[in-house]
């Protein structure tokens, strides 16, 4: 979990193809053959995410904002691209050409990117009264919000999106 999904990689003997492409691991398998131990890294976030979001996608869901740039966001980015969506990262600071800051989220960007995935810990218990700082007033019923957080059941991010009609 945060931030060890990336930091553990140098200690592993092997990565499966998805974990290697993503650059993050959340499952480690210990394989012992003829007295030799081998640690293999996998990423189950990819499969869990793509299988859960794919049925929710509509033809107008072509572009996605990924909130956060940690290990989980890498799996989400890989999964969204596998599903044919163009992605843009949102972070507190600009890292590269494929990243914007929260302050740079204009109504035009919000209108263009109809899928928004929260990959940050913002809003997780015990700070359930917080949420990522996006312009929620720009959300519409065509927007699909997805939160990786599981505690609380309904995060403030999801509630504020729902209040604007987002799914």
Predicted regions and their residues:
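Short helix-loop-beta connector
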Residues: 57-63, 140-141
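Rossmann-like adenosine-cofactor binding region
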Residues: 97-167
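NAD(P)-binding Rossmann-fold cofactor-contacting core
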Residues: 82-100
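Short, well-ordered alpha-helices that flank and scaffold nucleotide-derived cofactor binding pockets
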Residues: 10-13, 51, 55, 78, ...
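Active-site glycine-rich loop that binds ribose-phosphate moieties when present
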Residues: 48-59, 71, 98-104
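Short glycine-rich anion-binding loops that position phosphate/pyrophosphate groups of nucleotides
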Residues: 2-9, 72, 121-124, 151
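Phosphate/diphosphate ligand-binding glycine-rich loop within oxidoreductases
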Residues: 1-56
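Glycine-rich adenosine-cofactor-binding loop
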Residues: 43-46, 53, 62-81
